[in-house]
Amino acid sequence: MVVEYRKLQPEVILTHSYEDPYNPDHPYANMLTLQTRVYAQAAGYPAEGKQLGAPPVFIFEPHQPEQCEFKPQVLLDITPVYEIKEKAMESMEAQEHLWNYYRDLAKRRGTQAVRNSGKKGIKYAEAYQRVYPQVASEFS
């Protein structure tokens, strides 16, 4: 996977939460994602490709956030692409039982995004948790 990271040079990385009592493979995916990023950044790691920079890593919101120690830190406006997200979600028939949950969640996160940003055009949003601190030259 280190070779793939170095080949792709991702600008952003998304992964599962650190904990998930219902999906034990999700924390393993998280661990593998984070370890691979570290190795792909390491100058001395023996793998092909250009050393990876420092793409930010975000944990996407699981459907049981309270049980996964998820803490929303970033609200992403998905209003312009919500219909595409909805079609993609509906293509996963095995998770039909979650469709309404995620529709409602996108609306709730949209309301929170409006409240936290003052941008009234936001109807739908997603929540993410940062893995590493944000580096900035000024507050925004």
Short names for language-model regions:
Residues 1-140:
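Metal-dependent de-N-acetylase/amidase catalytic core
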